[in-house]
Amino acid sequence: MASSIIYEDKICTVYKTGVVKYALLEFLSEYTLNYRKPVEIHWSKSDTGGHAVVACSTRRIGVDIEQMKPRRYEAISRRYFNEVTDDKETFYNLWCQKEAYTKWKKDKIAHNLKADIDRRLIPLEGLPNDVVGYICY
């Protein structure tokens, strides 16, 4: 079971830390009410442009969100991806998927930019129009 909580972050890292703690407490309270055995908890967080997301699960999980900004999409994708694109949305979808996958693997992004993703990726809903996000598990 996985859950995610999305909050606008208008203050600073202290607030983001509070969001992580709140998400973990909410997730744990659900399990402590229903189970008496210890539960292994996995969590992942991401923030961009004043927004933060936290994902909690009983299995490995990775999450990433990115605010879409103007960049040299074709040059970056040619250098780092197997797929070449000059489209902003396609670029950010690929980047976000690879970041979420990297967090799931607990690895470095440089090792996974050209990797084929063999895990389930789900797009996050409810984000602002200029923000894209994925959860990997």
Residue ranges and their predicted role:
Residues M1-Y137:
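Core catalytic alpha/beta fold that binds nucleotide/phospho-ligands
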